[in-house]
């Protein structure tokens, strides 16, 4: 399942979306803005943009590949 959304990702909702009793783990990565500077300005947030159709197509390809390569039942 690949979802492109504008709101922040809720890790509990993501886990529940692909929960399977046969699975023994749920692995996520969560990036945060670190205390850093860019060109002498404080970094407070990150903004992302996406070409939605391309992003969704590529995201679905990545998930399909992961499902074929690893012994997993789902990916979000």
Label every PLM stretch briefly.
Residues 1-76:
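N-terminal, polar/charged subdomain of small-to-medium soluble alpha/beta proteins
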């Amino acid at each position: 399942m690949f979802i492109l959304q504008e709101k922040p990702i809720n890790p509990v909702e993501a886990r529940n979306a692909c929960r399977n009793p046969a699975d023994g783990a749920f692995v996520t990565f969560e990036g945060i803005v670190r205390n850093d500077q860019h060109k002498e300005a404080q970094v407070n947030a990150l903004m992302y943009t996406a070409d939605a159709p391309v992003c969704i197509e590529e995201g679905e390809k990545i998930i399909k590949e992961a499902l074929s390569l690893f012994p997993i039942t789902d990916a979000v």
